[in-house]
Amino acid sequence: PIDIYNHGKMKRDFTYIDDLINCIYELSKIIPENKNNLLKVSNDDSLSSSAPWRVVNIGNNNPVNLMNFITEIEKCLGKKAIKNFMDIQKGDVPNTWSENKLLRELIGFAPETKVSSGIKNFVNWYQSYYSHKNEKE
């Protein structure tokens, strides 16, 4: 069984791995504009273009209902999950999402792979990988 917290009343902003890799690759090409200013930037200013580092959210900016996510996995697998509905965990939040405005400004795009496509791709990869692995054993 899978534990489903807050009785499934949650939303999450899922990001497909290929999108994540592409964004990180593009971000790695961005070099601070003025190397002479690196020492003048305060350590807490991660948004400065001359900081030696920067925090950038990478995500679809499109929260998905957890139950829809599970239904999509069930559809791809052709199986119904055994669900164990539970109360929300202490400290958890019902909804999360990624603000990707800075990401779009920096690299000109943000992740856009639909959750249904990402799940389908992942399930296909997983089944293929583990069927080949099991054949070798």
Model feature map: region roles:
Residues P1-E137:
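C-terminal substrate-binding subdomain of Rossmann-fold SDR/epimerase-dehydratase oxidoreductases
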